[in-house]
Amino acid sequence: MDIKNMIINNPLIKNMIDKKEVGWTNPKEMNYTEYEKKLPLKDQELKEAEERLKRFAPFIKKVFPETEETYGIIESPLEEIFNMQKELEKKYHTEILGKLYLKMDSHLPVAGSIKARGGVYEVLKHAEELAMEAGLLKLEDDYSILADKKFKDFFSKYKIQVGSTGNLGLSIGITSAALGFQVIVHMSADAKKWKKDMLRSKGVQVIEYESDYGKAVEEGRKNSDADPMSYFVDDEKSMNLFLGYTVAASRIKKQFDKKGIVINKEHPLIVYIPCGVGGAPGGVAYGLKRIFKENVYIFFVEPVLAPCMLLGMQTGLHEKISVYDVGIHGITHADGLAVARPSGLVGRLMEPILSGIFTVDDYKLYDYLRILNETENKRIEPSSCAAFEGVVSLLKYEDSKKYIENRIGKNINNVYHVCWATGGKMVPQEDMEIFLNTYLK
């Protein structure tokens, strides 16, 4: 790989190496009508994922009492954040046309992060397959029986493993332990202590690594492959995780319907999602595109210090390039996004549908968190706050400004902006106070 040459001919990568914030629009994005003719996933697969989660709802309701109100459906609020919108406009000298909403996956039941979607789904699917193969479960059963001792005894013979910077580990660990599986979570150096402590309190074995996320995943995969009773949840390559995330789209559609909001050409939707390895934002993006088609525009946001998806997509090298290859160290306060190498599976699935990617300086994550807390009395993880950079920077860069003018034009006044908060509910109070009092600039 001729990195030197690539940098000389690529001003965007040069800016990334210089740790400057950048905005990029995706030149490979396809016209939706053309894209629809060759969908990589069958709609039936998305529907099956939704149906499976419905089957498991009685079990979820039984073992996670916080889901009682929603009858075992794991979902988060969608709320307008008008005061935040006004404060962002004032502080960053910008105009946010349309209305700003927060999708609060930060407050999802069970695991308190977006990973409660894909992570929970993949564990449930694996459990269903094992129980059905053993003749213990039938499709027409009331799945609350999975909480019975005979199932726990059955699952206790099996192991589930995952590599994580934190939130996926929590999601897999909590769900697997509730079913009775033995669980091993391989955690990178970036993982927060409280996340490791919480997992251990639920009987999960946590293996810590001095190195980064990629190493934790690699070791976890190797460890699991050597054990015939072990199943590995692969954040870099898992289609089951991806499918679990897609279900978010049909859920947010129902939330819009309830609010009397119709997404169409005149009232488009722009969604900003923090991105690490890519699985969660990729799955959500794919689902949104299938439902809102050409009327939704999706931007990922990554830390300036770990912009792996941007590097992979912009060069077209995907998982074959790491931020280390261009001299970026990958160490960031956005611990949930501290990933050096992107998922190739997701990068390729995003090529025809993603609008673009922004990067954000670490210091702003804490600034955004304080503004959200002061204006809306809501608290989320610093990693989640990356989403706000998207809405603030949309018209800041020439590229994204032109993109919006060409695609949306005067309808920008009617846009529904959704910042996707990816985690935060489970952060201990004392850690949150530290976040709120962290100033990097």
UniProtKB/Swiss-Prot annotation:
Keyword Lyase set for record: yes
CDD domains the UniProt entry points to: D-Ser-dehyd
Keywords: Lyase, Pyridoxal phosphate
Obligatory cofactor(s): pyridoxal 5'-phosphate
Lyase is among the record's keywords: yes
Residues that bear N6-(pyridoxal phosphate)lysine: 115
Domain of life: Bacteria
Catalytic activity: D-serine = pyruvate + NH4(+)
Gene Ontology terms describing biological process: D-serine catabolic process
Gene Ontology molecular functions: D-serine ammonia-lyase activity; hydro-lyase activity; pyridoxal phosphate binding
EC number of this enzyme: 4.3.1.18
InterPro entries referenced in this protein's UniProt entry, alphabetically: D_Ser_am_lyase (IPR011780), Ser/Thr_Dehydratase (IPR050147), TrpB-like_PALP (IPR001926), TrpB-like_PALP_sf (IPR036052)
Class in the EC hierarchy, top level: lyase
Protein family (similarity comment): Belongs to the serine/threonine dehydratase family. DsdA subfamily.
Protein name: Probable D-serine dehydratase
Originating organism: Fusobacterium nucleatum subsp. nucleatum (strain ATCC 25586 / DSM 15643 / BCRC 10681 / CIP 101130 / JCM 8532 / KCTC 2640 / LMG 13131 / VPI 4355)
Lineage: Bacteria, Fusobacteriati, Fusobacteriota, Fusobacteriia, Fusobacteriales
